[in-house]
């Protein structure tokens, strides 16, 4: 896309929001409580603050304020307000390609924020536990928050990921013409690295005329030991392993498709 000469500040708002899910099987009530305590500590407010602060570094934002909170019995949230970092617009890369993991990227932000909320969850029947992290990166300026996508997914356990990206508002060029988007985008997948794309099955649902983009990701490889908490698959019978595998796959597909699936 040809670079635009704008009248004043770039007023477009670009919002990236996504849910990241980690799935686990805990055989007993004690193991379920242990998993919730483990994941709650692993992603406490301090750790999340470190992740989001590094995200600010990746996209070149200045941190204005940090609000963080750990909740009882579980969960945490962090919100960071960020400000613009003046840069030469000629140095900003507007092309569609994966962001860094974290190499330096320059951004131009104003009235922007980055926030995360966590939701550990379990049920006494079935042994299934889930951890969900809701993340939103919203920026005003010339660069898309999609540049931070690779880093954030790699930092969190990601069996399933749902991503939404939207550009809102408009900005004017020097001739008074309104522009409702200032960069080319066909798919969120174009901002992911090849190694990440090779790990997931993905599907897009995009509304191009509204500048709304949606991608869902489901981990391809399934290794049962990755999903067991304090239990080894080899300590289970073959029937138990098959039942647990079926339950985990059903849980993952239901989250991925966003609907309950009847047992076969």
From Swiss-Prot:
Description of post-translational modifications: Is synthesized initially as an inactive proenzyme. Formation of the active enzyme involves a self-maturation process in which the active site pyruvoyl group is generated from an internal serine residue via an autocatalytic post-translational modification. Two non-identical subunits are generated from the proenzyme in this reaction, and the pyruvate is formed at the N-terminus of the alpha chain, which is derived from the carboxyl end of the proenzyme.
Species this chain originates from: Salmonella paratyphi A (strain AKU_12601)
Name of encoding gene: speD
E.C. no: 4.1.1.50
Protein name from the UniProt record: S-adenosylmethionine decarboxylase proenzyme
Catalytic residues in the record: 112 (schiff-base intermediate with substrate), 117 (proton acceptor), 140 (proton donor)
GO molecular function, one term: adenosylmethionine decarboxylase activity
The protein's required cofactors: pyruvate
Function (record text): Catalyzes the decarboxylation of S-adenosylmethionine to S-adenosylmethioninamine (dcAdoMet), the propylamine donor required for the synthesis of the polyamines spermine and spermidine from the diamine putrescine.
Enzyme class per UniProt: lyase
């Amino acid at each position: 896309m040809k670079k635009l000469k704008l009248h004043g500040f770039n007023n477009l708002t670009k919002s990236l929001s996504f849910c990241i899910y980690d799935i686990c099987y805990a055989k007993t009530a004690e193991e379920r409580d242990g998993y919730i305590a483990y994941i709650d500590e692993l992603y406490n407010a301090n750790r999340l603050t470190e992740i989001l602060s590094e995200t600010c570094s990746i996209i070149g934002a200045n941190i204005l304020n940090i609000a963080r909170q750990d909740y009882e019995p579980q969960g945490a949230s962090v919100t960071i307000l960020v400000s613009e970092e003046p840069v030469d617009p000629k140095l900003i890369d507007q092309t569609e390609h994966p962001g860094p993991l974290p190499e330096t990227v320059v951004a131009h932000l104003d009235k922007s924020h980055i926030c995360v909320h966590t939701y550990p969850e379990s049920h006494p029947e079935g042994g299934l536990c889930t951890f969900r992290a809701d993340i939103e990166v919203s920026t005003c300026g010339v660069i898309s928050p999609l540049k931070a996508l690779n880093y954030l997914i790699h930092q969190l356990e990601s069996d399933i990921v749902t991503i939404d990206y939207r550009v809102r508002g408009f900005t004017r060029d020097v001739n008074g013409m309104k522009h409702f988007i200032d960069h080319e985008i066909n798919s969120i997948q174009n901002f992911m690295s090849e190694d990440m794309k090779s790990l997931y099955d993905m599907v897009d649902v995009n509304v191009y005329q509204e500048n709304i983009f949606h991608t869902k990701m489901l981990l391809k490889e399934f290794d049962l030991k990755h999903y067991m908490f304090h239990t080894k698959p080899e300590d289970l019978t073959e029937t138990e392993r098959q039942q647990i595998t079926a339950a985990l796959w059903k849980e993952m597909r239901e989250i991925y498709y966003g609907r309950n699936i009847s047992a076969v």
